[in-house]
Amino acid sequence: MTHEEHHAAKTLGIGKAIAVLTSGGDAQGMNAAVRAVVRVGIFTGARVFFVHEGYQGLVDGGDHIREATWESVSMMLQLGGTVIGSARCKDFREREGRLRAAHNLVKRGITNLCVIGGDGSLTGADTFRSEWSDLLSDLQKAGKITAEEATKSSYLNIVGLVGSIDNDFCGTDMTIGTDSALHRIIEIVDAITTTAQSHQRTFVLEVMGRHCGYLALVTSLSCGADWVFIPECPPDDDWEEHLCRRLSETRTRGSRLNIIIVAEGAIDKNGKPITSEEIKELVVKRLGYDTRVTVLGHVQRGGTPSAFDRILGSRMGVEAVMALLEGTPDTPACVVSLSGNQAVRLPLMECVQVTKDVTKAMNDRKFDEAMKLRGRSFMNNWEVYKLLAHIRPPVSKTSATMHTVAVMNVGAPAAGMNAAVRSTVRIGLIQGNRVLVVHDGFEGLAKGQIEEAGWSYVGGWTGQGGSKLGTKRTLPKKSFEQISANITKFNIQGLIIIGGFEAYTGGLELMEGRKQFDELCIPFVVIPATVSNNVPGSDFSVGADTALNTICTTCDRIKQSAAGTKRRVFIIETMGGYCGYLATMAGLAAGADAAYIFEEPFTIRDLQANVEHLVQKMKTTVKRGLVLRNEKCNENYTTDFIFNLYSEEGKGIFDSRKNVLGHMQQGGSPTPFDRNFATKMGAKAMNWMSGKIKESYRNGRIFANTPDSGCVLGMRKRALVFQPVTELKDQTDFDHRIPKEQWWLKLRPILKILAKYEIDLDTTEHAHLEHISRKRSGETSI
């Protein structure tokens, strides 16, 4: 970018006005989006207005449309719901109402509208835009606006952000609020599990989703439910028989509870609703189980937004402002959405149309089509669910076709490791393999701490944090002889390694060892699982989302304490080794003033600039500061050094406190994202493994010595991909245990702009308008 273009971002909004409103049902994370729109709007030189109470405020005007300031969006990030209010508005559906809304906007010179809401709200916005010129000529004829005002506001730009807990909008992988709603549901499922086990009960849980089964489907994957009912895929006609057989089989195998998840819009093949009460009566009548119904209701909309939703809201808000200010009369109204982990712009009406097509397909009972239209991510969730829940576990048998696969954890514990182990073990058994589990990583493999795992061995593991198998950082090189002996002794034909940077390095060592030891010529795959998110070959690691949420919750509490004492700055040290992922993302999610990381070298002048920035901040109404520091960002500028510097420089203006978060970041129950991600990664790894073993089978034994027989399974942009460890070698900085290129570094400017730094907006995400049809035929997403 040239210097002129740098400058352009800061002046892009001069003379323009943006209005932001939230409409329809509220969703956690809407406040993060509002905050980002306001702050980035002000950063570009535009005036930004809040529209209170959704479209109703737009129609009523007056005090409902107020100018926003930088401070007016402070302390909003961690609040659920929408601070500027939302309402379902009948007036806006009538042309008369839209005429009044247009009048209110023209009088204030607002020609850019950012709408945060569901598909109904966004369709309304598009109608408003298409009528705009007619509305203006009507207002001019009625003498309500002058010709000059009409010319000045000749066209209206509209950008939509999808805020909906149902995740029912086509074209976006995740809508704002969905992840937080899953957090609420999983908290409740975890709580119910303990009481159900105590009494050997069956629970029927009803979750939201009138026309979309996303919440129900992901919940059932995340808690290992016995059955799920979703509107997109009604059960077969004899489902009652199947359900009861499934429940009694689970009990026979020693489980003390059954969980059935029902989406509120669940139907059978004929379109007749399936209710929770109906399911309860069926189970009681046929099986005589003690059965309870819990309807979760509006709990799912409430509570604190998750880290994912805060980051999603912030990223989408920044992109929305850019889309509005770059808009011309010819650009179509667009939706800013997420695909994989990339921000994309999609034509609003294309997305709305596909969303309507899903409803139509369901009404016409074309359920296969409805599933396809929901997108790849939804389909993959459904496939994994069907595998884990509906296929009967095989009776153990020793046949010639059976292969032996071992599963192990390596590195430091990370939440979600157990979910990955569970899904690899069960998918392996379903495919007719013998699955062994190795305790204590490569050390256990050398010592022979290996046992066979059956179906119920991993029962209830999905929601448990840490590593049940035990994990060590030891690398295999020192013990190749013992490891080779055990591979032969236990007849191990494939290895699934779940872990962090050590798992990846261990994989490279196994590759090297193949030259000396033929026994090591077996396929292996690494599933990245570490809080640091520093494994080459993957944008995300299992466990990082849980750690991020732990840091966020702590930062919220610390900010609350600082808000009470006033004029206080907190310096918080996060984990991550040399990788600044946790510090950066937690900085975005918690609204930090700065985040110091190794990947972005800083000097004493930068520290001084931050102190001066905080001195200025204390003069405003926001009298507190939050600074994050990655544990290894600089060997000399330690947490103590930064704390002492801030304490000295801030004397008389603010006082400082420091907090080292430590190992609490590795613990806790895994978040829905980590459970779901780990389950899908485990399933995909085991499928790959079965194929690879068959490929490598020669003359009665396994022999795999090609580079593609040792891979890392990672999420790259929009797809899950297997990459040979040897190919990833060049992309790795081994001294600092990080990948040479990291996607999240491009989000750092957003962090700085939202903290009011005068920087150049040159490296934020540049999303171009794509078409939804092209997106759907792309790579396999997860």
From Swiss-Prot:
Location in or out of the cell: Cytoplasm
Glycan-bearing residues: 532
Region feature (Interdomain linker): 391-403
Residue numbers of Phosphoserine PTMs: 133, 377, 669, 777
UniProt cross-references to PROSITE patterns, sorted A to Z: PHOSPHOFRUCTOKINASE
GO biological process: canonical glycolysis; fructose 1,6-bisphosphate metabolic process; fructose 6-phosphate metabolic process
Enzyme Commission code(s) on record: 2.7.1.11
Gene3D superfamilies associated with the record: 3.40.50.450, Phosphofructokinase domain (3.40.50.460)
CDD domains to which the protein is assigned, alphabetical: Eukaryotic_PFK
Cofactor(s), names only, from the UniProt record: Mg(2+)
Regulation: Allosterically activated by ADP, AMP, or fructose 2,6-bisphosphate, and allosterically inhibited by ATP or citrate.
GO molecular function: 6-phosphofructokinase activity; ATP binding; fructose-6-phosphate binding; metal ion binding
Catalytic residues of the enzyme: 166 (proton acceptor)
N6-(2-hydroxyisobutyryl)lysine: modified positions: 559
Claim: Magnesium is one of the keywords in the record: yes
A Pfam family this chain is assigned to: PFK
Post-translational modification: GlcNAcylation decreases enzyme activity.
Binding site for ATP: 25, 88-89, 118-121
Keywords on record: Acetylation, Allosteric enzyme, ATP-binding, Cytoplasm, Glycolysis, Glycoprotein, Hydroxylation, Kinase, Magnesium, Metal-binding, Nucleotide-binding, Phosphoprotein, Transferase
Positions of modified residues (N-acetylthreonine): 2
Residues that coordinate or bind Mg(2+): 119
Any one GO cellular component localisation term in the record: 6-phosphofructokinase complex
Subunit structure, interactors included: Homo- and heterotetramers. Phosphofructokinase (PFK) enzyme functions as a tetramer composed of different combinations of 3 types of subunits, called PFKM (M), PFKL (L) and PFKP (P). The composition of the PFK tetramer differs according to the tissue type it is present in. The kinetic and regulatory properties of the tetrameric enzyme are dependent on the subunit composition, hence can vary across tissues. Interacts (via C-terminus) with HK1 (via N-terminal spermatogenic cell-specific region).
Protein task: Catalyzes the phosphorylation of D-fructose 6-phosphate to fructose 1,6-bisphosphate by ATP, the first committing step of glycolysis.
Family, as annotated: Belongs to the phosphofructokinase type A (PFKA) family. ATP-dependent PFK group I subfamily. Eukaryotic two domain clade 'E' sub-subfamily.
Protein name listed in UniProt: ATP-dependent 6-phosphofructokinase, muscle type
